[in-house]
Protein backbone atom coordinates (compact mmCIF):
# COMPACT_ATOMS: atom_id res chain seq x y z
CA UNK A 1 0.00 0.00 0.00
CA UNK A 2 1.06 3.58 -0.51
CA UNK A 3 2.42 5.49 2.49
CA UNK A 4 -0.66 7.68 2.90
CA UNK A 5 -2.95 4.63 3.32
CA UNK A 6 -2.71 2.44 6.42
CA UNK A 7 -5.04 -0.27 7.74
CA UNK A 8 -4.75 -1.35 11.38
CA UNK A 9 -6.90 -4.03 13.11
CA UNK A 10 -8.08 -2.80 16.53
CA UNK A 11 -9.08 -4.98 19.49
CA UNK A 12 -12.00 -3.38 21.38
CA UNK A 13 -12.40 -6.22 23.90
CA UNK A 14 -13.95 -9.66 24.25
CA UNK A 15 -17.39 -11.04 25.05
CA UNK A 16 -19.21 -14.38 24.81
CA UNK A 17 -22.32 -15.44 22.92
CA UNK A 18 -24.34 -18.62 22.58
CA UNK A 19 -22.57 -21.01 20.20
CA UNK A 20 -25.72 -22.50 18.72
CA UNK A 21 -27.23 -19.11 17.97
CA UNK A 22 -23.99 -17.89 16.38
CA UNK A 23 -23.49 -20.93 14.17
CA UNK A 24 -27.12 -21.31 13.15
CA UNK A 25 -28.09 -24.52 11.40
CA UNK A 26 -24.57 -25.98 11.53
CA UNK A 27 -25.00 -29.09 13.72
CA UNK A 28 -23.21 -29.11 17.05
CA UNK A 29 -21.84 -32.56 16.25
CA UNK A 30 -19.82 -30.92 13.47
CA UNK A 31 -18.66 -27.64 15.01
CA UNK A 32 -17.78 -28.98 18.47
CA UNK A 33 -14.91 -30.98 16.94
CA UNK A 34 -12.96 -27.79 16.24
CA UNK A 35 -14.66 -24.97 18.15
CA UNK A 36 -14.29 -24.55 21.91
CA UNK A 37 -17.04 -23.26 24.20
CA UNK A 38 -17.23 -22.48 27.91
CA UNK A 39 -19.34 -24.29 30.52
CA UNK A 40 -22.38 -22.28 29.39
CA UNK A 41 -21.87 -23.31 25.75
CA UNK A 42 -20.75 -19.81 24.81
CA UNK A 43 -18.26 -18.84 22.13
CA UNK A 44 -15.55 -16.35 23.00
CA UNK A 45 -15.74 -13.45 20.55
CA UNK A 46 -13.19 -10.71 19.97
CA UNK A 47 -14.59 -7.30 19.05
CA UNK A 48 -12.59 -6.57 15.91
CA UNK A 49 -12.62 -3.03 14.57
CA UNK A 50 -10.65 -1.56 11.70
CA UNK A 51 -8.73 1.73 11.71
CA UNK A 52 -8.00 3.22 8.29
CA UNK A 53 -5.70 6.17 7.70
CA UNK A 54 -6.65 7.48 4.29
CA UNK A 55 -4.50 10.58 3.70
CA UNK A 56 -5.96 13.25 6.07
CA UNK A 57 -8.83 11.05 7.26
CA UNK A 58 -8.68 8.62 10.19
CA UNK A 59 -11.62 6.25 9.81
CA UNK A 60 -12.80 3.75 12.42
CA UNK A 61 -15.17 0.92 11.54
CA UNK A 62 -17.56 0.25 14.46
CA UNK A 63 -17.10 1.21 18.11
CA UNK A 64 -17.48 -1.97 20.16
CA UNK A 65 -19.59 -2.41 23.30
CA UNK A 66 -18.32 0.61 25.20
CA UNK A 67 -18.04 1.15 28.96
CA UNK A 68 -21.69 1.47 30.03
CA UNK A 69 -22.77 -2.15 30.63
CA UNK A 70 -24.03 -2.79 34.15
CA UNK A 71 -22.66 -5.67 36.24
CA UNK A 72 -25.55 -7.97 35.33
CA UNK A 73 -24.99 -7.59 31.59
CA UNK A 74 -21.22 -7.87 31.99
CA UNK A 75 -21.80 -11.25 33.61
CA UNK A 76 -24.28 -12.37 30.97
CA UNK A 77 -21.92 -11.50 28.13
CA UNK A 78 -18.68 -12.31 29.99
CA UNK A 79 -17.47 -8.90 28.84
CA UNK A 80 -13.97 -7.54 29.38
CA UNK A 81 -13.16 -3.90 29.96
CA UNK A 82 -13.57 -1.46 27.06
CA UNK A 83 -10.18 -1.78 25.37
CA UNK A 84 -10.71 0.60 22.46
CA UNK A 85 -9.11 3.79 23.87
CA UNK A 86 -6.03 1.86 24.99
CA UNK A 87 -5.84 -0.04 21.70
CA UNK A 88 -5.86 3.25 19.80
CA UNK A 89 -3.11 4.63 22.04
CA UNK A 90 -0.98 1.55 21.36
CA UNK A 91 -0.91 2.45 17.65
CA UNK A 92 -0.29 6.16 18.24
CA UNK A 93 -3.78 7.68 18.16
CA UNK A 94 -6.47 8.91 20.54
CA UNK A 95 -10.25 9.09 20.36
CA UNK A 96 -9.92 12.77 19.47
CA UNK A 97 -7.99 11.91 16.30
CA UNK A 98 -10.81 9.95 14.67
CA UNK A 99 -12.41 11.92 11.82
CA UNK A 100 -15.00 9.34 10.74
CA UNK A 101 -16.81 6.40 12.33
CA UNK A 102 -18.53 3.93 10.02
CA UNK A 103 -21.18 1.86 11.82
CA UNK A 104 -21.94 -1.40 10.06
CA UNK A 105 -25.12 -1.54 12.16
CA UNK A 106 -26.42 -0.41 15.54
CA UNK A 107 -26.41 -3.57 17.68
CA UNK A 108 -24.85 -3.16 21.13
CA UNK A 109 -21.54 -4.87 20.34
CA UNK A 110 -20.88 -2.52 17.41
CA UNK A 111 -22.54 0.74 18.43
CA UNK A 112 -22.28 0.64 22.22
CA UNK A 113 -19.07 2.66 22.07
CA UNK A 114 -20.63 5.66 20.30
CA UNK A 115 -21.14 7.23 23.72
CA UNK A 116 -18.93 6.65 26.77
CA UNK A 117 -19.25 7.54 30.42
CA UNK A 118 -16.37 9.77 31.51
CA UNK A 119 -16.38 10.89 35.16
CA UNK A 120 -20.10 10.22 35.38
CA UNK A 121 -20.91 12.24 32.25
CA UNK A 122 -22.21 10.70 29.03
CA UNK A 123 -20.39 12.10 26.00
CA UNK A 124 -19.43 11.13 22.47
CA UNK A 125 -16.42 8.82 22.50
CA UNK A 126 -15.24 10.35 19.21
CA UNK A 127 -16.38 13.99 19.45
CA UNK A 128 -14.59 15.11 16.28
CA UNK A 129 -15.88 12.29 14.08
CA UNK A 130 -18.69 12.16 11.57
CA UNK A 131 -20.67 8.95 12.18
CA UNK A 132 -21.91 7.20 9.03
CA UNK A 133 -25.07 5.07 9.29
CA UNK A 134 -27.49 3.65 6.76
CA UNK A 135 -30.84 5.48 6.85
CA UNK A 136 -32.80 2.22 7.20
CA UNK A 137 -30.64 1.16 10.15
CA UNK A 138 -31.05 4.50 11.89
CA UNK A 139 -34.83 4.46 11.54
CA UNK A 140 -35.29 0.95 12.95
CA UNK A 141 -32.88 1.67 15.81
CA UNK A 142 -34.65 4.90 16.74
CA UNK A 143 -38.15 3.37 16.66
CA UNK A 144 -37.76 -0.43 16.71
CA UNK A 145 -40.75 -2.67 16.07
CA UNK A 146 -41.57 -5.66 18.28
CA UNK A 147 -39.23 -7.95 16.34
CA UNK A 148 -36.26 -5.60 16.76
CA UNK A 149 -36.96 -4.04 20.16
CA UNK A 150 -34.55 -6.28 22.09
CA UNK A 151 -31.72 -5.62 19.62
CA UNK A 152 -31.74 -1.83 19.84
CA UNK A 153 -31.48 -0.20 23.25
CA UNK A 154 -29.28 2.83 22.66
CA UNK A 155 -31.88 5.50 21.94
CA UNK A 156 -30.27 7.92 24.44
CA UNK A 157 -26.89 7.49 22.74
CA UNK A 158 -28.40 8.00 19.31
CA UNK A 159 -30.19 11.14 20.46
CA UNK A 160 -26.90 12.59 21.72
CA UNK A 161 -25.20 11.76 18.42
CA UNK A 162 -27.98 13.53 16.53
CA UNK A 163 -27.97 16.48 18.93
CA UNK A 164 -24.23 17.05 18.47
CA UNK A 165 -24.61 17.16 14.68
CA UNK A 166 -22.17 14.30 14.15
CA UNK A 167 -24.50 12.01 12.20
CA UNK A 168 -24.57 11.39 8.44
CA UNK A 169 -27.23 9.11 7.02
CA UNK A 170 -26.65 7.35 3.70
CA UNK A 171 -28.95 5.23 1.57
CA UNK A 172 -27.27 2.41 -0.32
CA UNK A 173 -23.75 2.82 -1.70
CA UNK A 174 -21.73 5.83 -0.59
CA UNK A 175 -18.11 6.96 -0.95
CA UNK A 176 -16.74 7.89 2.49
CA UNK A 177 -13.23 8.79 1.32
CA UNK A 178 -11.14 8.27 -1.78
CA UNK A 179 -10.49 4.62 -0.95
CA UNK A 180 -13.37 3.71 1.41
CA UNK A 181 -16.93 2.93 0.33
CA UNK A 182 -19.99 1.58 2.17
CA UNK A 183 -22.61 -0.66 0.63
CA UNK A 184 -25.98 -1.60 2.11
CA UNK A 185 -26.63 -5.36 2.02
CA UNK A 186 -29.17 -5.95 4.81
CA UNK A 187 -29.45 -9.49 6.10
CA UNK A 188 -28.05 -9.28 9.61
CA UNK A 189 -30.13 -6.13 10.16
CA UNK A 190 -32.42 -4.17 7.88
CA UNK A 191 -29.83 -1.48 7.26
CA UNK A 192 -26.61 -3.46 7.54
CA UNK A 193 -23.67 -2.10 5.52
CA UNK A 194 -20.35 -3.62 4.58
CA UNK A 195 -17.23 -1.53 4.01
CA UNK A 196 -15.19 -1.90 0.83
CA UNK A 197 -11.55 -0.80 0.80
CA UNK A 198 -10.31 0.11 -2.67
CA UNK A 199 -6.61 0.85 -2.41
CA UNK A 200 -4.28 1.40 -5.38
CA UNK A 201 -2.42 -1.87 -4.84
CA UNK A 202 -5.05 -4.06 -3.13
CA UNK A 203 -8.70 -4.36 -2.23
CA UNK A 204 -10.44 -5.79 0.84
CA UNK A 205 -13.84 -5.85 2.52
CA UNK A 206 -14.95 -5.54 6.15
CA UNK A 207 -17.90 -7.92 6.15
CA UNK A 208 -18.89 -7.31 9.76
CA UNK A 209 -21.49 -9.71 11.13
CA UNK A 210 -22.33 -11.05 7.68
CA UNK A 211 -19.12 -13.10 8.04
CA UNK A 212 -18.08 -12.55 11.68
CA UNK A 213 -15.66 -15.48 12.03
CA UNK A 214 -13.74 -17.88 9.83
CA UNK A 215 -16.33 -20.69 10.15
CA UNK A 216 -18.93 -18.29 8.74
CA UNK A 217 -17.07 -18.27 5.43
CA UNK A 218 -19.06 -21.40 4.57
CA UNK A 219 -22.20 -20.19 2.82
CA UNK A 220 -24.73 -22.30 4.80
CA UNK A 221 -23.36 -21.12 8.18
CA UNK A 222 -25.66 -18.21 9.00
CA UNK A 223 -26.37 -17.15 12.57
CA UNK A 224 -29.81 -17.24 14.16
CA UNK A 225 -29.53 -13.50 14.80
CA UNK A 226 -30.18 -12.55 11.16
CA UNK A 227 -33.25 -10.48 10.36
CA UNK A 228 -33.21 -12.08 6.88
CA UNK A 229 -31.22 -15.28 6.32
CA UNK A 230 -31.92 -15.02 2.60
CA UNK A 231 -30.38 -11.55 2.32
CA UNK A 232 -27.40 -12.63 4.43
CA UNK A 233 -26.84 -15.58 2.11
CA UNK A 234 -26.96 -13.27 -0.93
CA UNK A 235 -24.52 -10.88 0.74
CA UNK A 236 -22.12 -13.69 1.63
CA UNK A 237 -22.22 -14.98 -1.93
CA UNK A 238 -21.53 -11.50 -3.32
CA UNK A 239 -18.65 -10.92 -0.89
CA UNK A 240 -17.03 -14.26 -1.68
CA UNK A 241 -17.34 -13.61 -5.41
CA UNK A 242 -15.32 -10.41 -4.97
CA UNK A 243 -12.36 -12.73 -4.34
CA UNK A 244 -10.58 -10.24 -2.08
CA UNK A 245 -9.44 -10.43 1.57
CA UNK A 246 -12.28 -10.40 4.10
CA UNK A 247 -11.90 -8.83 7.55
CA UNK A 248 -13.83 -10.60 10.33
CA UNK A 249 -15.71 -8.75 13.08
CA UNK A 250 -15.46 -11.38 15.83
CA UNK A 251 -12.86 -14.07 15.16
CA UNK A 252 -10.45 -14.52 18.07
CA UNK A 253 -7.65 -16.21 16.12
CA UNK A 254 -7.38 -14.41 12.79
CA UNK A 255 -8.26 -10.91 11.59
CA UNK A 256 -8.91 -11.72 7.94
CA UNK A 257 -8.69 -14.30 5.18
Identify the meaning behind each predicted range.
Residues 59-61, 102, 131, 204-206, ...:
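Residue-level marker for buried hydrophobic side chains located in beta-strands
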Residues 66, 79-93, 97-109, 125-184, 229-244, ...:
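Metallo-beta-lactamase
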Residues 74, 112-121, 257:
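Metal-dependent catalytic neighborhoods of phosphoester/phosphodiester hydrolases
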Residues 111-115, 183-193:
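Active-site glycine- and acidic-residue-rich loops that bind
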Residues 5, 14-90, 194-209:
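Conserved beta-strand hairpin/beta-sheet module of binuclear metal-dependent hydrolase folds
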Residues 35-40, 119-120, 182:
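Short, P/G- and charge-enriched loop/turn segments at secondary-structure junctions
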Amino acid sequence: MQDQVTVIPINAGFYSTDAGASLGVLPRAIWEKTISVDDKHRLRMRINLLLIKDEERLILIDTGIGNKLNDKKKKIYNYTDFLLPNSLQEVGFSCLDITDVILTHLHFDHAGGIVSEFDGVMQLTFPNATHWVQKAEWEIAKTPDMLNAAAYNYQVDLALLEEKGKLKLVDGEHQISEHVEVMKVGGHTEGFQIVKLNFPDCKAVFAGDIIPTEPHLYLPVISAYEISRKDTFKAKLMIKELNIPIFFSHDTEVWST
